[in-house]
Amino acid sequence: MLELTKEQIQQLVDTIESKQDCHCSVSNSMRTIWITSSDGENELRVAFLGNFALVFSRVEFAHKRCGTMTAILFALKKICEENGVHRIIIQSVLTPEMESFCCKSGCKPDPNSTMEVGGVLTGDYFFDF
């Protein structure tokens, strides 16, 4: 079963802290990594889905459109490539900002889990590479 290394987790923490100007803590529960800022304004959940995919969700950043998600996706893609994983699943996209990010980044909506709500195509998105 794949797991993120301490170094990989720290890279994600460093990215969030520098882009969001915050201090983060990490918790690890059942091979799932939760990164949250002390003020509760920033959050990210990351876990491998077996050897099939890396899943991230619970994306919330106080400062939007400053490159945080682009840097996170780049780091996660590199981690996946190092482990022979070729799919990232962005789970529970709910906001126009995340929908826009997914489309801009080449992610495809999962036809089995997405639906339009208030003009936003919500649900899961796949990033295959």
Language-model segments: residues:
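Conserved hydrophobic beta-strand within the GNAT/NAT acetyltransferase core sheet
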Residues: 88-92
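Conserved active-site alpha-helix within GNAT-family acetyltransferase domains
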Residues: 82, 93-116
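Short amphipathic alpha-helix that is part of the acyltransferase structural core
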Residues: 1-32
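Conserved acetyl-CoA-binding loop-helix of GNAT-fold acetyltransferases
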Residues: 65-78
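C-terminal "cap" of GNAT-fold acetyltransferases
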Residues: 114-129
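A conserved beta-strand-loop-helix scaffold within acyl/acetyltransferase catalytic domains
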Residues: 32, 36-53, 57-58
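A short, internal acetyl-CoA/4′-phosphopantetheine-binding micro-motif in the GNAT/acyltransferase core
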Residues: 57-66
